[in-house]
Amino acid sequence: MPSFKSTTQLQNTQLRGAQAEDRALAHLRRQGLEPVVRNYRCKGGEIDLVMRAPDGTLVFVEVRQRSGRGFGGAAASVTPAKQRRVLLAAAHYLATLAQVPPCRFDVVALEPGRLDWLQHAFDQDAAGAGS
């Protein structure tokens, strides 16, 4: 039998996710990146943050938060399936642009007392998007 989250549990989960994105956004801004879009969604995918690096590179950022390092921690939770969904959303987003800039895919992994920014965390080949 499937388990369903109560409205309160869902709201708490969404709040924690928004707070994690806020922390990631603040960190990336301190590193010189500028926000372009937050929570870009399309059918089949979503991107937590789209940022622009000082060199003009468009950076698609997946933000993951975990309460501990069990099961490999926050970074390990970005599975190939999740990577494919981010890549799909990125392709959709890029199709809206007149000119496609250089791009990369980063992960910001948050755990208690720790924030890791993993640049070039994955690409189309690693996610198996071409298969």
Curated annotation (Swiss-Prot):
<protein>
    <recommendedName>
        <fullName>UPF0102 protein H16_A3579</fullName>
    </recommendedName>
</protein>
<dbReference type="InterPro" id="IPR011856">
    <property type="entry name" value="tRNA_endonuc-like_dom_sf"/>
</dbReference>
<dbReference type="Pfam" id="PF02021">
    <property type="entry name" value="UPF0102"/>
</dbReference>
<dbReference type="InterPro" id="IPR003509">
    <property type="entry name" value="UPF0102_YraN-like"/>
</dbReference>
<dbReference type="GO" id="GO:0003676">
    <property type="term" value="F:nucleic acid binding"/>
</dbReference>
<comment type="similarity">
    <text>Belongs to the UPF0102 family.</text>
</comment>
<dbReference type="InterPro" id="IPR011335">
    <property type="entry name" value="Restrct_endonuc-II-like"/>
</dbReference>
